[in-house]
């Protein structure tokens, strides 16, 4: 029995030495030994081969259902006025004359049926479906047996992900999070000074780099000259808590976010000991006022870290950008927009908080192939003369969506948890009524107020 324990101890010692020497230490100094790059290149070749084999199998087996991309129906992208004009072609009339035709009803019937089948909102809160299988059963709805070789490759992938990568990633996650909790707690006892701020930044960025290695993260940063400066506000589209790890690998931030429980709550409480992060309860009005005051004080001090905010207020599945809350744009500071786009071939980064708790989500990430993403730093933006916070937020959101290749939606991500506001319905009613009574349709506005 003692011999077995000795062998186990030796194996553990060898394992930790390899992890520390080849991964943890290089990560702490921001150095890559190239293992992840080689792994990603090999993975790309494997997935390309699997895609070709699946396509050939679909030709050989006509009954095999084709993989569906995100979206199951094709919709017109035109405005209400454009689509109704198209319907009225058989009865050409001038909209400005205030005429009504019965065929107008077909437009609303069509839109209603489209939204019953597939609306623009709820599909943003579920995982993105892939056009081609990435050898993960969780991302393939229509998989059937195609060939022995493909099945063997899938089996080898399961072994690699669960028997090799998962233990390695759990080890790195434990090291990284332990470093964060212990390090921030110790730094928190120091008096406020430049040394404390430097140590806090060191603890945070080291933790994020180790955790990124634990996800086999490959991150490409573009336009680094536009990185957020101290005293500014960094806003980004939000897909998952991993967004923080991705951005903080390239610089430190003071963060603003919703209070969480469980593992996430432990991490939040430890982080705030050494750095002025702002955690709040969304349902508490007094918390909102306190957050607003702290944000104003923060951005007025040009020596403090840039604030990282996700104005959508919830996680979206990285296919679109939803409405930005105006609160982040009411302080008159410089906004540094950042677009984050994940490559879904290697793993689904979206956190469906209604379906998975934090631990379950992390395990899903650790059993994925890798996290591959692009980060674009956009030029800083400021509020223009005569521009209110709502229009400023929409302008920033559009810039992020355009750069990241995401769909720009005006809908509120809060619909994930609440019902549609009456104002949404009223805006559509106002637009149509302005058409049939002959008013200038541009007087009506579309989207949430």
Swiss-Prot record:
Domain notes: The HXXXXD motif is essential for acyltransferase activity and may constitute the binding site for the phosphate moiety of the glycerol-3-phosphate.
Transmembrane feature ranges: 9-29, 146-166, 170-190, 358-378
Catalytic activity: sn-glycerol 3-phosphate + an acyl-CoA = a 1-acyl-sn-glycero-3-phosphate + CoA; a 1-acyl-sn-glycero-3-phosphate + an acyl-CoA = a 1,2-diacyl-sn-glycero-3-phosphate + CoA; dodecanoyl-CoA + sn-glycerol 3-phosphate = 1-dodecanoyl-sn-glycerol 3-phosphate + CoA; sn-glycerol 3-phosphate + hexadecanoyl-CoA = 1-hexadecanoyl-sn-glycero-3-phosphate + CoA
UniProtKB keywords: Acyltransferase, Endoplasmic reticulum, Lipid biosynthesis, Lipid metabolism, Membrane, Phospholipid biosynthesis, Phospholipid metabolism, Transferase, Transmembrane, Transmembrane helix
EC numbers: 2.3.1.15, 2.3.1.51
Organism: Danio rerio (Zebrafish)
Source species taxonomy: Eukaryota, Metazoa, Chordata, Craniata, Vertebrata
GO molecular function: 1-acylglycerol-3-phosphate O-acyltransferase activity; glycerol-3-phosphate O-acyltransferase activity
Protein name: Glycerol-3-phosphate acyltransferase 3
Pathway note: Glycerolipid metabolism; triacylglycerol biosynthesis; Phospholipid metabolism; CDP-diacylglycerol biosynthesis; CDP-diacylglycerol from sn-glycerol 3-phosphate: step 1/3
Main localization category: endoplasmic reticulum
The gene coding this protein: gpat3
Motif HXXXXD motif, residue numbers: 238-243
InterPro entries per the UniProt record, alphabetical: LPCAT1-like, Plipid/glycerol_acylTrfase
